[in-house]
């Protein structure tokens, strides 16, 4: 089964770093995406806020460069996580992160 997502946007919630009891580092943040997409011959505004989690040692170094306002592209897979309140939310599990040069 295919499960791949690439999403570019701006980090809109500060990264939260934790280490699991088994020693695996995790970094969580929220990515806001805004764009214009073409659908059925018409332009439409596309917008979402996607929770992102980065797990493992491989990508942790780049997460230290990520702050609110950072523009990035994230590639990975999506999965549902159940919150403490019982509601499910879609989460992007990052496998590759690229900082987008702002040109400043």
UniProtKB/Swiss-Prot annotation:
GO terms for molecular function: single-stranded DNA binding. Residues 1-101 form the SSB domain. One of its GO terms (cellular component) is primosome complex. SUPFAM superfamilies: Nucleic acid-binding proteins. Involved in the restart of stalled replication forks, which reloads the replicative helicase on sites other than the origin of replication; the PriA-PriB pathway is the major replication restart pathway. During primosome assembly it facilitates complex formation between PriA and DnaT on DNA; stabilizes PriA on DNA. Stimulates the DNA unwinding activity of PriA helicase. Homodimer. Interacts with PriA and DnaT. Component of the replication restart primosome. Primosome assembly occurs via a 'hand-off' mechanism. PriA binds to replication forks, subsequently PriB then DnaT bind; DnaT then displaces ssDNA to generate the helicase loading substrate. This is Replication restart protein PriB. It comes from Salmonella arizonae (strain ATCC BAA-731 / CDC346-86 / RSK2980). The gene is priB.
């Amino acid at each position: 089964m295919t499960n791949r997502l690439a999403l570019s946007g701006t980090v809109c919630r500060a990264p939260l770093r934790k280490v699991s009891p088994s020693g695996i580092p995790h970094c969580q943040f929220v990515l806001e995406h805004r764009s214009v997409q073409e659908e059925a011959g018409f332009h439409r505004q596309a917008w979402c806020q996607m929770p992102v989690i980065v797990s493992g040692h491989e990508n942790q170094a780049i997460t230290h460069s990520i702050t609110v306002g950072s523009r990035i592209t994230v590639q990975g897979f999506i999965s549902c996580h159940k919150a403490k309140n019982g509601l499910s939310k879609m989460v992007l599990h990052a496998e590759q992160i690229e900082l987008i040069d702002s040109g400043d």
